[in-house]
Swiss-Prot record:
Principal location: cytoplasm
Positions that bind NAD(+): 158-160, 192, 221-226, 244, 279, 300-302, 347
One Gene Ontology molecular-function label: adenosylhomocysteinase activity
Protein name: Adenosylhomocysteinase
Pathway stated in the Swiss-Prot or TrEMBL entry: Amino-acid biosynthesis; L-homocysteine biosynthesis; L-homocysteine from S-adenosyl-L-homocysteine: step 1/1
Function: May play a key role in the regulation of the intracellular concentration of adenosylhomocysteine.
E.C. number(s) listed in UniProt: 3.13.2.1
Record keywords: Cytoplasm, Hydrolase, NAD, One-carbon metabolism
Regions annotated as coiled coil: none
Cofactor(s) in the UniProt record: NAD(+)
């Protein structure tokens, strides 16, 4: 249902959900002291005054604090969902009603609605785009070349989105600066590892109420998200198997104490399969065919392409929902495969996404990346740019201070030593 308000355009499920969203946003804020400090500074300095901004992100309590910080900084912001199943409808309602931020997102929206919301966002003629998977940027490049002149730059938070941006740059169509937030140390070391690890298992447990102890859990991909997922699954008593295509990551998984197998060998052994690769069809027909009866598969990468769901649907006698966000595919071979969250991000489809404490740093990076683009307008070459090291370090310092933790600094003697080549044995 589209709600209407006399104050601003929006499409959310129900504005009556705003009180619950307000309460949950306030709770999340307790764990986000870094972003709060940035918001307070933005409110004084107004770095985005007069600028139009589009944020394509998962509409969660944590994202709400990013949007509020950007508005405090003077941004004329519009918010849309980066995934059809990740929107928290109460949060969307609160942002509209309590903060007067236009939101176009509803949990469970179909692909046509999702794509229409991308077009609505681009109708805002953004000067800055915060993207999560690069759908908005890709649409801009493919369909709205005339609007690129309005753009100062973009930021991207996901591995999947960075892969797309690199491909765009290689093809010569990334003609504006894009800040790679994903590779900031204060993002991927914590968000990708600790955030994904915890929230993925949270989503699986909420969807199934299954006991992980003693189960064979196959983690497909051993990047930072895979590392975190494997670590947490082992911590809950699972027997973890890792599959990889990168020999270096495979060695790392082995030395971290995990079994490493080709997917063809892991498929008949697994009870639960979790994909975290950002690539297409990493679990496909030949794997589904040999899985145990009742095997559970889910995705914690980005898009819903990691599992070949078209194959499953084509080879299913029956598909039925057995629990919320849990569908059983009864196959023609007599076995069944259980798919969680329609193959989309299980941590957001069935749970609430990453904990606020890690998103505090990720969204601090997003906020400061936007400020970096504004401060360097016209100075940055087209293509990908890293978060400045000093920004990364400052976010870490602020986080430590908020935790009541303080660290040492180099003495003058040590600084002199590490900058000299004359001292030796």
């Amino acid at each position: 249902m589209t709600a209407t308000s006399p104050r601003l355009k929006h499409e959310v499920k129900d504005l009556a959900l705003a009180p619950l969203g307000r309460q949950r946003i306030e709770w999340a804020g307790r764990e986000m002291p870094v972003l709060r400090q940035i918001r307070d500074r933005f409110a004084q300095e107004k770095p985005f005054a007069g600028l139009r901004l589009v944020a394509c992100a998962h509409i969660t309590t944590e994202t709400a604090h990013l949007a509020i910080a950007l508005k405090a900084g003077g941004a004329d912001a519009v918010l849309i969902a980066s995934n059809p199943l990740s929107t928290q409808d109460d949060v969307a309602a609160s942002l509209v009603l309590d903060h007067e931020i236009p939101v176009f997102a509803q949990k469970g929206e179909d692909n046509a609605t999702y794509n229409r919301h991308v077009q609505i966002a681009l109708d805002h003629r953004p000067n800055i785009i915060i993207d999560d998977g690069s759908d908005v940027v890709a649409t801009l490049v493919q369909e709205r070349q005339h609007q690129i002149a309005d753009l100062i730059g973009t930021t991207e938070e996901t591995t999947t989105g960075i892969v797309r941006l690199r491909a765009m740059f290689k093809d010569g169509v990334l003609t504006f600066p894009a800040v790679n937030v994903n590779d900031a140390d204060t993002k991927h070391f914590f968000d990708n590892r600790y955030g994904t690890g915890q929230s993925t298992l949270d989503g699986i447990i909420r969807a199934t109420n299954i006991l992980l102890a003693g189960k064979n859990v196959v983690v497909v991909g051993y990047g930072w998200c895979g590392k975190g997922t494997a670590l947490r699954a082992r911590g809950m008593g699972a027997n973890v198997i890792v599959t990889e295509i990168d020999p270096i990551k495979a060695i790392e998984a082995v030395m971290d104490g995990f079994r490493v197998l080709p997917m063809a060998e892991a498929a008949p052994q697994g009870d639960i399969f979790i994909t975290v690769t950002g690539n297409k069809h990493v679990v496909r027909g030949e794997h589904f065919d040999v899985m145990k009866d009742g095997a559970i598969v889910c995705n914690s990468g980005h898009f819903d392409l990691e599992l070949d769901l078209k194959y499953l649907a084509a080879n299913a006698k029956e598909i039925k929902e057995v629990r919320p966000f849990t569908e059983e595919y009864k196959l023609t071979n007599g076995k069944s495969v259980v798919v969680l969250g329609q193959g989309r991000l299980i941590n957001l489809a069935a749970a609430e996404g990453h904990p606020s404490a890690v998103m505090d740093m990720s969204f601090a990076n997003q906020a400061l990346a936007c400020e970096y683009l504004v401060k360097n307008k016209g100075k940055l070459a087209p293509g990908l740019h890293s978060i400045p090291v000093e920004v990364d370090q400052e976010i870490a310092r602020l986080k430590l201070q908020a935790m009541g933790i303080y660290i040492d600094s180099l003495t003058p003697e040590q600084i002199e030593y590490i900058n000299s080549w004359t001292s030796g044995t």
